[in-house]
């Protein structure tokens, strides 16, 4: 049971009440204070101080300070007046208990309100943080959009420059063709005039000779001049006709022509593209430039669009396989190389170089995947097309040594060379 502390002092003014309660050696952290309109309690075990105030106070403006072993209360009266005493006298126990319970209930309600207010402040702070984050994201998004717009403008300017260059090139070609045609017509006219003049002069001279030597001997007339037209057989491939395979070459040319005419942007939903962007050859050139600049992913995107427009051109798959090889997409390299080899049929001298590249790239990808037997098969297929290529011979020999050797150090050394092919 606590000990009631009665050794307190108090004084008042018309508006305030000042109370001093000694803690009697108790630590300040061990004391508990409860203050309401009509009740004041200080619990500092084993002592207890409580006061049932003479009149109501404003607990929101009242204060308590702990220091030097004393608790000092500054209580602000609700109505200015001089109290007859600090506490009410002759109170019943039931009334005192009721005042205590009301004070505790109000303190709990006040604590709940403070908790709610704290939670509300926390929500406001989180809302403010979210708004600030959204503003930062909006600024970053705007910056990214500006960068994209700048890149789009640059690409548009490059495209316009390319169009102008193509227009000037076509104009120059037309002018050159016109000049060549005029020059040919002029030479033809001069040649025809020269033939007529020679024929007339010969006729006059012959007449004179006949008149002079008619008595001696009559000679036959001079043979008239003429032109023999020679037309050579048109040949797309540089090989001699006796060494070529005409049927296979014609089939290859026919397939190439059909592939160039196979573009259809309407069915693919690409009607919004410009005329240049609908041209697979233009996209192929764009991919080559991006590849040369080291932007392999952008080159793949350009070639993807070109293949969507026309999936019958082997050069698109061949170039994309090179990009995938640079990006270490080895399985895609194998797929594109295989597709290019399917389209590079029938095998003719005109597509020999492309077939060599397809075999070498697929073989390199197989070796990177440690499928050395399959890689060696592709290198040997490339050597059948060009048996004089010393680099491919050296690479094939290295792969054979990797297959035949079981030493890990040797294998690592050879793989390093294969990666540098």
Swiss-Prot record:
InterPro entries: CS_dom, CS_DYX1C1, Dynein_assembly_factor_4, HSP20-like_chaperone, TPR-like_helical_dom_sf, TPR_rpt
Cell compartments where the protein resides: Nucleus; Cytoplasm; Cell projection, Neuron projection; Dynein axonemal particle
Keyword Transmembrane helix in record: no
GO molecular function annotations of the record: nuclear estrogen receptor binding
Listed CDD domains: p23_DYX1C1_like (cd06469)
Keyword vocabulary terms for this entry: Cell projection, Coiled coil, Cytoplasm, Neurogenesis, Nucleus, Repeat, TPR repeat
Nucleus recorded as keyword: yes
Repeat positions for TPR: 280-313, 315-347, 356-389
Domain of life from the UniProt record: Eukaryota
Chain intervals for the UniProt region annotation (Disordered): 103-122
CC per GO annotation: dynein axonemal particle; extracellular region; neuron projection; nucleus
GO biological process: determination of left/right symmetry; epithelial cilium movement involved in extracellular fluid movement; heart development; inner dynein arm assembly; nervous system development; outer dynein arm assembly
Protein function: Axonemal dynein assembly factor required for ciliary motility.
Protein name as catalogued: Dynein axonemal assembly factor 4
Native organism: Xenopus laevis
């Amino acid at each position: 049971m606590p000990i009631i502390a009665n050794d307190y002092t108090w004084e008042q003014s018309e508006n305030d009440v000042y109370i001093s309660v000694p803690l009697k050696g108790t630590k300040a952290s061990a004391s508990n204070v409860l203050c309401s309109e009509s009740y004041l309690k200080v619990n500092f075990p084993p002592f207890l101080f409580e006061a049932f105030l003479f009149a109501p106070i404003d607990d929101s403006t009242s204060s308590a300070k702990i220091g030097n072993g004393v608790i000092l209360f500054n209580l602000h009266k609700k109505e200015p007046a001089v109290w007859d005493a600090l506490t009410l006298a002759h109170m019943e126990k039931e009334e005192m208990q009721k005042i205590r319970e009301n004070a505790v209930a109000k303190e709990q309600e006040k604590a709940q309100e403070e908790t709610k207010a704290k939670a509300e402040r926390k929500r406001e702070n989180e809302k403010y943080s979210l708004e600030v984050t959204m503003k930062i994201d909006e600024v970053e998004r705007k910056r990214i959009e500006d960068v994209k717009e700048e890149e789009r403008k640059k690409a548009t300017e490059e495209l316009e420059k390319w169009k102008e260059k193509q227009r000037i090139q076509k104009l120059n070609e037309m002018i050159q063709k016109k000049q060549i045609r005029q020059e040919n017509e002029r030479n033809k006219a001069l040649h025809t005039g020269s033939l007529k003049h020679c024929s007339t002069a010969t006729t006059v001279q012959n007449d004179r000779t006949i008149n002079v030597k008619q008595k001696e001997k009559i000679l036959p007339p001079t043979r008239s001049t003429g032109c023999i037209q020679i037309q050579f057989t048109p040949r797309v491939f540089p090989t001699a006709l006796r060494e070529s395979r005409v049927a296979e070459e014609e089939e290859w040319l026919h397939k190439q022509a059909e592939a160039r005419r196979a573009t259809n942007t309407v069915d693919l939903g690409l009607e919004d593209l410009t005329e240049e962007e609908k041209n697979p050859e233009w996209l192929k050139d764009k991919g080559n430039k991006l590849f040369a600049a080291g932007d392999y992913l952008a080159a793949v995107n350009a070639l993807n669009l070109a293949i969507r427009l026309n999936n019958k051109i082997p050069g698109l798959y061949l170039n994309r396989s090179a990009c995938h090889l640079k990006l270490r997409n080895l399985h895609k390299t194998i797929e594109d190389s295989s597709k290019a080899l399917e389209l590079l049929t029938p095998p003719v001298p005109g597509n020999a170089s492309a077939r060599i590249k397809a075999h070498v790239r697929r073989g390199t990808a197989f070796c990177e995947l440690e499928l050395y037997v399959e890689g060696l098969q592709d290198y040997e297929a490339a050597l059948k097309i060009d048996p004089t290529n010393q680099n491919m011979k050296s690479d094939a020999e290295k792969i054979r040594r990797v297959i035949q050797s079981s030493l890990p150090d040797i294998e690592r050394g050879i793989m390093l060379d294969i990666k540098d092919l």
